[in-house]
């Protein structure tokens, strides 16, 4: 199989000292002069931009300029009007206190206090009606930038095919049905600009198209920290995902070194705007940003091939991906530093469309037939712009051409959205928020459009990216390449065998969670088992590993309810096997991701500030959750797809526990099914395969964003469907399996794994 490629296209476009005017201008527009008499703002100050062709009002922290933030000098020699959102003209600008928008609506619950507006530091609380579960933040605080902290509060009963997408504060939503193909539409109040997706469709698999919208005022900016976290979490996932598909084992983040073949598995195109509107200092700042980005990519140990070009009226190519040294990051950085702002002095317009057409040409192929493997190429375009252009036409049409070229969004069953990411950075007060939003990708739980105050903030974004100091192992990564064996596809899987004199041999499964520990079920062991009788094998290796000790959850007691007529009680059925010697990771031996760890935060593409609650909402939402377990059949490992009943089918799933052999005296399922269990099996919505006795201790896994995250440990089942090796024969509908929910035993995991550098939240 040809190696899949990742093309990362960096397009750094026109940012001026304050942007450009709100309407496209001709390249040779004559300068006019506007008087400064009467332009003052009450409570603040102003600064001139573009040589006096525009001005920006400045207010103290916690205040914003009313009714506009910027004004342009018109050809008549007068400043643009001070016009409110309601199209009214005011005589003098003033600084007003920043307030956060109020909820336009809130479904299936209530919020308090109710107020026409909310001042900085005000708090608002949300609560759901009976039968609904709260997702997001129950309490939110109005921040200094006019935005609410936390996540959108949503009350959901899990009844829809897709989860309730919610109503972000400040927006209005049209549509309350969440069936497959249903569409919801969002609107903003007059004067506010919608960022994200105005329309979202419920798709196959239960996810919404697009990204969550928000309503933005002109004075709102993203902080460098917010931008760095959101951008980096998505960018690194793209890079890591490309490595996994390429068939290479990255090893630890800071240690992995991948030497690519001559065709390259990653191409990064850096396209730098050198037009007249930028200015020398901003051009230099943009080069520093790109230098930091090159360094960041190099920190992953990959050796991509770079392309480098600048443009104004026309593009100028400086480094081609076919150059012999294009994968040498130091050499590319040297070429970047040699670029001069004067290179485009004679033709200094801003032709954004032509720059994107140059990118399109580099993505294209000669002839009618595409090259082999073209549809496995991933593309990321990063645009830094004010959203305006002064020649060439609308650049959004080229983004549409690129999507068509890459066959993205054409087939609803295979939209291929993962193969194109367009990030847009708006820089300065004169950013056209509508245009930059139109250029950016719209993806669920991701942010692709950002607005920063100035070049200093933009440089800070890339500095914070490069300043990430923690080195984390890449968990939950698999390599699905052609020559891979079962352990390439399940590199975490461990086999545990226990030999007992005069009692025979018992086998269980487990999951590698760190270099010293395997997570499994406690019932696989007996109190009198000797260390030398317990063996562990990993990575498909024939050599058994010696163990140091077995750590049981302190609340596990299989005989805990014998007096009540319950012969076996599996609550807290988890154990950690500590190995005597440190594991050496490789292509067939990697750890699985555990919830509420920093590695899983990155795997889920969440901000670095993500909470354990957000992990749970992503991995175990209130619905039927698609999951899998790995079963050993003969000498092969096979993935079995099941559904965790975590919505309206949960109660009926748990009730079937009373039909298990030995539980005849159990009157209520809650006697044996505690809140620590997850339930799979049955025939609704699909006929789930069941676990077998030898599968005990293995991981229950959620596969999300090309990563594998363990959410449970296989514990016990209602029916032994694998007796006499006749698997899945005449399986009754009440055949259920129960798994220990890892979210319920996190304190114990965190304590026992505290020295394993997993970064528990």
From Swiss-Prot:
<dbReference type="InterPro" id="IPR033116">
    <property type="entry name" value="TRYPSIN_SER"/>
</dbReference>
<dbReference type="InterPro" id="IPR028341">
    <property type="entry name" value="Complement_B"/>
</dbReference>
<keyword id="KW-0865">Zymogen</keyword>
<feature type="disulfide bond">
    <location>
        <begin position="59"/>
        <end position="95"/>
    </location>
</feature>
<keyword id="KW-0645">Protease</keyword>
<feature type="disulfide bond">
    <location>
        <begin position="34"/>
        <end position="73"/>
    </location>
</feature>
<feature type="binding site">
    <location>
        <position position="350"/>
    </location>
    <ligand>
        <name>Mg(2+)</name>
    </ligand>
</feature>
<feature type="active site" description="Charge relay system">
    <location>
        <position position="696"/>
    </location>
</feature>
<keyword id="KW-0720">Serine protease</keyword>
<feature type="disulfide bond">
    <location>
        <begin position="100"/>
        <end position="142"/>
    </location>
</feature>
<feature type="disulfide bond">
    <location>
        <begin position="188"/>
        <end position="215"/>
    </location>
</feature>
<dbReference type="InterPro" id="IPR009003">
    <property type="entry name" value="Peptidase_S1_PA"/>
</dbReference>
<dbReference type="InterPro" id="IPR000436">
    <property type="entry name" value="Sushi_SCR_CCP_dom"/>
</dbReference>
<keyword id="KW-0179">Complement alternate pathway</keyword>
<feature type="domain" description="Sushi 3">
    <location>
        <begin position="160"/>
        <end position="217"/>
    </location>
</feature>
<feature type="domain" description="Sushi 1">
    <location>
        <begin position="32"/>
        <end position="97"/>
    </location>
</feature>
<keyword id="KW-0325">Glycoprotein</keyword>
<feature type="signal peptide">
    <location>
        <begin position="1"/>
        <end position="22"/>
    </location>
</feature>
<feature type="disulfide bond">
    <location>
        <begin position="475"/>
        <end position="593"/>
    </location>
</feature>
<dbReference type="InterPro" id="IPR001254">
    <property type="entry name" value="Trypsin_dom"/>
</dbReference>
<keyword id="KW-0768">Sushi</keyword>
<comment type="similarity">
    <text>Belongs to the peptidase S1 family.</text>
</comment>
<feature type="glycosylation site" description="N-linked (GlcNAc...) asparagine">
    <location>
        <position position="282"/>
    </location>
</feature>
<dbReference type="GO" id="GO:0006508">
    <property type="term" value="P:proteolysis"/>
</dbReference>
<feature type="glycosylation site" description="N-linked (GlcNAc...) asparagine">
    <location>
        <position position="139"/>
    </location>
</feature>
<keyword id="KW-0165">Cleavage on pair of basic residues</keyword>
<feature type="binding site">
    <location>
        <position position="277"/>
    </location>
    <ligand>
        <name>Mg(2+)</name>
    </ligand>
</feature>
<feature type="active site" description="Charge relay system">
    <location>
        <position position="573"/>
    </location>
</feature>
<keyword id="KW-0391">Immunity</keyword>
<keyword id="KW-0732">Signal</keyword>
<keyword id="KW-0677">Repeat</keyword>
<feature type="glycosylation site" description="N-linked (GlcNAc...) asparagine">
    <location>
        <position position="375"/>
    </location>
</feature>
<keyword id="KW-0964">Secreted</keyword>
<feature type="site" description="Cleavage; by CFD">
    <location>
        <begin position="256"/>
        <end position="257"/>
    </location>
</feature>
<keyword id="KW-1015">Disulfide bond</keyword>
<dbReference type="Pfam" id="PF00089">
    <property type="entry name" value="Trypsin"/>
</dbReference>
<keyword id="KW-0460">Magnesium</keyword>
<dbReference type="Pfam" id="PF00092">
    <property type="entry name" value="VWA"/>
</dbReference>
<feature type="domain" description="Peptidase S1">
    <location>
        <begin position="474"/>
        <end position="754"/>
    </location>
</feature>
<dbReference type="Pfam" id="PF00084">
    <property type="entry name" value="Sushi"/>
</dbReference>
<feature type="disulfide bond">
    <location>
        <begin position="653"/>
        <end position="679"/>
    </location>
</feature>
<dbReference type="GO" id="GO:0006957">
    <property type="term" value="P:complement activation, alternative pathway"/>
</dbReference>
């Amino acid at each position: 199989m040809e190696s899949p490629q990742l093309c990362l296209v960096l397009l750094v476009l026109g940012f001026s000292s304050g942007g450009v005017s709100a309407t496209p201008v001709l390249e040779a527009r004559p300068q006019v002069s506007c008087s400064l008499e009467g332009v003052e703002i009450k409570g603040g100050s102003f600064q001139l931009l573009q040589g006096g062709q525009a001005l920006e009002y400045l207010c103290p922290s916690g205040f914003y300029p009313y009714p506009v933030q910027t004004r342009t000098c018109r050809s008549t020699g007068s400043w643009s009007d001070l016009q409110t959102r309601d199209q009214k003209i005011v005589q003098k600008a003033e600084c007003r206190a920043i307030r956060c928008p109020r909820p336009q609506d809130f479904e299936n619950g209530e919020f308090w206090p109710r107020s026409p507006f909310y001042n900085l530091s005000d708090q608002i609380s949300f609560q759901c009606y009976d039968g609904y579960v709260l997702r997001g933040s129950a309490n939110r605080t109005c921040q200094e930038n006019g935005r609410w902290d936390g996540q959108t509060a949503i009350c959901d009963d899990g009844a829809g095919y897709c989860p309730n997408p919610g109503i972000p504060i400040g927006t209005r939503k049209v549509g309350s049905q969440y069936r497959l193909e249903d569409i919801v539409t969002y609107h903003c109040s007059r004067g506010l600009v919608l960022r994200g997706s105005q329309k979202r469709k419920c798709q196959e698999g239960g996810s919404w198209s697009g990204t969550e919208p928000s309503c933005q005022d002109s004075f709102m900016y993203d902080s460098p920290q917010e931008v760095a976290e959101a951008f980096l979490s998505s960018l690194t996932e793209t890079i890591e995902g490309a490595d996994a598909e390429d068939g290479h084992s990255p090893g630890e983040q800071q240690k992995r070194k991948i030497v690519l073949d001559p065709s390259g598995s990653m191409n990064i195109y850096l396209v730098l705007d050198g037009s007249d509107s930028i200015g020398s200092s901003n051009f230099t700042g943009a080069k520093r940003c790109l230098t930091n980005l090159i360094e960041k990519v190099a920190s992953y140990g990959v050796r991509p091939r770079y392309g480098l070009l600048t443009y104004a009226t026309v593009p100028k190519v400086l480094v081609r991906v076919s150059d012999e040294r294009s994968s040498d990051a130091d050499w590319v950085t040297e070429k970047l530093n040699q670029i001069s702002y004067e290179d485009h002095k004679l033709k200094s317009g801003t032709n954004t469309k032509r720059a994107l057409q140059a990118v399109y040409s580099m993505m294209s192929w000669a002839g009618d037939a595409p090259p082999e493997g073209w549809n496995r190429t991933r593309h990321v375009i990063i645009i830094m712009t004010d959203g305006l252009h002064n020649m060439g036409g609308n650049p959004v049409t080229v983004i549409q051409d690129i999507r068509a070229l890459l066959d993205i969004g054409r087939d609803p069953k295979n939209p291929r959205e993962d193969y194109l990411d367009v990030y847009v950075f708006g820089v300065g007060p004169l950013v056209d928020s509508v245009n930059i939003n139109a250029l950016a990708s719209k993806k669920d739980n991701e942010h692709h459009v950002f607005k920063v105050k100035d070049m200093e903030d933009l440089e800070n974004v890339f500095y914070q990216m490069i300043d990430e100091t923690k080195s984390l192992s890449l968990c939950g990564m698999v390599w699905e390449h052609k020559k891979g064996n079962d352990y390439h596809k399940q590199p975490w899987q461990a086999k545990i065998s226990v030999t007992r004199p005069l009692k025979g041999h018992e086998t269980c499964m487990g999951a590698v969670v760190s270099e010293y520990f395997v997570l499994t079920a406690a019932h696989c062991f007996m109190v009198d088992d000797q260390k030398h009788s317990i063996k562990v094998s990993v990575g498909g290796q024939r050599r058994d590993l010696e163990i140091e000790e077995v750590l049981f959850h302190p609340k596990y007691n299989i005989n805990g309810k014998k007096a009540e007529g319950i012969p076996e009680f599996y609550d807290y059925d988890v154990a950690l096997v500590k190995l005597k010697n440190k594991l050496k990771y490789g292509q067939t031996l990697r750890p699985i991701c555990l919830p509420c760890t920093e590695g899983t935060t990155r795997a889920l593409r969440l901000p670095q500030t993500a909470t354990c609650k957000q992990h749970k909402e992503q991995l175990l939402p209130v619905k039927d959750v698609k999951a899998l377990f790995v079963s050993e059949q003969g000498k092969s490992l096979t993935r079995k797809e099941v559904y965790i009943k975590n919505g309206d089918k949960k109660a009926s799933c748990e009730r079937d526990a009373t039909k298990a052999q030995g539980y005849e005296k159990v009157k209520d399922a809650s006697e044996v099914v505690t809140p620590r269990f997850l339930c799979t099996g049955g025939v609704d919505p699909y006929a789930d395969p069941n676990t077998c006795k030898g599968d005990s201790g293995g991981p229950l896994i959620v596969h999300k964003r090309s990563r594998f995250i363990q959410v449970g440990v296989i514990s016990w089942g209602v029916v032994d469907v694998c007796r006499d090796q006749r698997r899945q024969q005449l399986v009754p509908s009440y055949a259920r399996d129960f798994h220990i929910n890892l979210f319920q035993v996190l304190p114990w995991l965190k304590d026992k794994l505290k020295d394993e550098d997993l970064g528990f939240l």
